[in-house]
């Protein structure tokens, strides 16, 4: 019976150690995902701004209908 208790105690210690490592890994992954979402949000805002600037530039640029052909 004492051998069984020792074996069970070792198994519990092993499981507690693995759980501690898993908790640390989960926290690290959570921090990484949070940082990535912040970066994705910043990039999304930047793309929206660039798209808006491009549309403004296209609106203000003279179109081909207003330009004379190169041979004139």
From Swiss-Prot:
The lineage of its organism: Bacteria, Pseudomonadati, Pseudomonadota, Alphaproteobacteria, Hyphomicrobiales. It comes from the Bacteria. This is Protein SlyX homolog. Pfam families: SlyX. Belongs to the SlyX family. Gene3D superfamilies: 1.20.5.300. Disulfide bonds: none annotated. Transmembrane segments: none annotated. InterPro entries: SlyX.
């Amino acid at each position: 019976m004492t051998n069984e208790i020792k074996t069970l105690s070792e198994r519990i210690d092993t499981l507690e150690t693995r759980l501690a490592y898993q908790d640390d890994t989960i926290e690290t992954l959570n921090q990484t995902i949070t940082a990535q979402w912040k970066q994705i949000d910043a990039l999304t805002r930047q793309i929206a701004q660039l798209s808006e600037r491009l549309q403004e530039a296209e609106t203000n640029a003279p179109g081909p209908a207003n330009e004379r052909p190169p041979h004139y």
